[in-house]
């Protein structure tokens, strides 16, 4: 949103288009890293926000996410939080076991923030994977987090994860799968 269009310009357009849709449409602000921008998106009419405070320690992540959860209540908007470190498919940030979500921390995070959905890290990465590469997901970790939190779980970095991985994610408890981490530039759309 920030790089492409101000939320007070895009929200009314999308809401108007959503009224014409035959299915429910959510206007989601994904990977909000700044409290001010997240609050602005909610004020401007976004129906959900994803708080990405995973760069902070657990306490900082809880604090920021809880603040947005409390703020979002007045708009009846949903809030997704993220715990664990999502890798990147390029550069030196490949997913490693120590970057995956800790199930006990996931439970604490969910309880202390009051989020509606939880994005977890269990082997996926943002961005496009190298050709022919299929990530290895830790389905036992996913299962344990689902059993502990008993809440909707989110997979970020679903693009290129492979059909079998996606099917198993749903079987093991993923409720939302995010594809395409970044928007294409206008020149890519022609």
Model-inferred region functions:
Residues 19-24, 147-152, 171-173:
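Short, surface-exposed connector motifs at secondary-structure boundaries
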Residues 36-40, 160-172:
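Catalytic cores of alpha/beta
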Residues 1-2, 54-56, 180:
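Short, acidic/turn-prone active-site loops that include or flank metal/cofactor-
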Residues 16-20, 34-51, 55, 66, ...:
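Alpha/beta enzyme core
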Residues 181-190:
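Single conserved hydrophobic/aromatic residue that forms the stacking wall/gate
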